[in-house]
């Protein structure tokens, strides 16, 4: 409401699934086209597919026909927009309406004679500060990754097939959370910086990078461990030690107001002195309803950490001699005076 007052908005309408969930609570199917509308008095109208959800943080719940005889309609955007526009017919004083410029359907904008304002930047900023219910879901997703790494350490050995490992890890994550996942990623390749699983067997001497990002009720985890297929070499251990040294520094200096860009630059210089390997990517990013959110630990952005941020730190070193590299990724919550480590499980190569 404070943001609406600052932007002098009479109404906010969101169409992205993440933002509908952020405002109204339910997580709808990826193929659906719900809408949520918040007016200047704080009243929320939800337009849901087919039937009203069992629970929603909405003052009014309307529905549109997303399916006809179980067939998914292709014109859902128009159908949900028509329902909302009909509900708004009696509204007065609508002059400035906030919408997501990247995705708001023309069916909606062409039916309203108002000035439209892009609300997406403000929504992404609001999403940075995680509420307790959001943290609970992120912690649940992280618990799934803990179990996946425990299993990976049991089954990774010379000759194991990447597809078999992928299937077992996915099953372990589902059993851990007790329901279907709402997302599943990211990297499941052995002797590779990352990528989807292949019909390939792990070989002795290789390193297996697991960058895991299961989603629980819309909220993502995103952390990484590297596991040696057998005994790690001296070069692999030297690279691991250089990477592991990054985390105490992060935990010592990050607090509200700390520059994420400066942190990236410092770690980049740390890893330049590694005896083997090159650091080739970002240092990390925020996460929540989307795997990559602010803050960006990256030279391309200039942002500062804020209390309530949940973010990743993922230093890595890559070289053919390492077969093919090491990446370790922790997840943190920014508190009032520092950080809380959310991924307090082993990071060793074996």
Language model segments and positions:
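Active-site neighborhoods and metal-handling regions in enzymes and metal-associated proteins
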Residues: 1-350
């Amino acid at each position: 409401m404070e943001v609406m007052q600052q932007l002098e908005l009479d109404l906010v309408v969101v169409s992205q699934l993440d933002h509908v969930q952020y405002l109204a609570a339910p997580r709808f199917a990826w193929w659906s086209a719900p809408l949520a509308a918040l007016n200047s008095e704080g009243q929320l109208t939800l337009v849901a597919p087919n039937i009203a959800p069992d629970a929603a943080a909405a003052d009014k719940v309307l529905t549109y026909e997303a399916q006809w005889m179980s067939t998914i309609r292709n014109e859902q955007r128009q159908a949900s927009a028509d329902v909302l526009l009909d509900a708004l017919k009696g509204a007065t004083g609508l002059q400035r309406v906030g919408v997501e410029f990247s995705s708001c359907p023309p069916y909606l904008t062409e039916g309203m004679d108002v000035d439209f304002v892009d609300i997406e930047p403000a929504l992404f900023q609001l999403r940075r500060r995680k509420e307790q219910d959001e943290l609970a879901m992120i912690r649940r997703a992280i618990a799934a990754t803990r179990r996946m790494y425990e299993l990976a350490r049991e089954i990774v050995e010379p000759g194991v097939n990447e597809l078999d490992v992928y299937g077992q890890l996915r099953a372990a994550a589902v059993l851990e959370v007790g329901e279907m996942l709402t997302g599943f990623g990211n990297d499941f390749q052995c002797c590779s910086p990352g990528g989807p699983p292949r019909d390939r067997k792990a070989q002795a001497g290789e390193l297996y990078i697991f960058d895991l990002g299961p989603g629980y009720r819309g909220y993502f985890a995103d952390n990484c461990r590297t596991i040696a297929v057998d005994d790690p070499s001296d070069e692999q251990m030297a690279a691991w030690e250089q990477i592991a040294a990054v985390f105490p520094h992060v935990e010592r200096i990050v607090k509200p107001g700390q520059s994420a860009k400066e942190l990236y630059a410092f770690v980049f210089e740390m890893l330049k002195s590694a005896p083997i390997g090159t650091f080739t990517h970002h240092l990390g990013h925020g996460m929540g309803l989307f795997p990559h959110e602010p803050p960006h630990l990256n030279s391309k952005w200039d942002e500062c950490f804020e209390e309530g941020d949940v973010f990743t730190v993922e230093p890595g070193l890559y070289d053919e001699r390492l077969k093919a590299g090491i990446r370790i990724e922790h997840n943190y919550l920014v508190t009032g005076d520092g950080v809380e480590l959310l991924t307090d499980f082993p990071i060793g190569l074996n």
